[in-house]
């Protein structure tokens, strides 16, 4: 299941205002409905720290209570420019899913480089 979270906050405000709710929404959905769910976080301003924080969620546990938690979650940041490209190119969900899962599996550690190579360039090259 794909969850979509959007914000109009900018810069580190997006990090402070969205990091916890986006993670909580996805984690709760995973625990309650579908452990294979993932999320795209759409913003008109993706600060490197926001990209980094969501990228790190892949490998860090999250706990709803002392007895309920998950080992990690897939939250993929997406700039509105790339969303526009997805819509203009009429990129199908199956293509997007494949692209997103490939991005999750990437070994690139530097957040802006990871985003540019695994999300932005891949969407532009579909």
List each model region and its residues.
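Catalytic core segments in nucleotide and nucleic-acid processing enzymes
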Residues: 1-123
């Amino acid at each position: 299941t794909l969850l979509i979270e959007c914000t109009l906050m900018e810069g580190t405000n997006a990090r402070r205002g969205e990091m916890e709710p986006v993670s909580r929404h996805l984690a709760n959905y995973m625990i309650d409905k579908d452990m294979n769910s993932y999320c795209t976080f759409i913003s008109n301003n993706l600060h490197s720290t926001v990209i980094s924080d969501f990228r790190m969620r892949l490998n860090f546990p999250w706990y709803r209570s002392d007895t309920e938690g998950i080992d990690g979650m897939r939250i993929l940041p997406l700039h509105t420019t790339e969303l526009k490209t997805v819509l203009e190119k009429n990129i199908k969900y199956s293509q997007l899913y494949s692209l997103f899962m490939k991005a999750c599996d990437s070994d690139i550690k530097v957040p802006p480089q990871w985003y540019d190579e695994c999300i932005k360039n891949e969407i532009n090259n579909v």
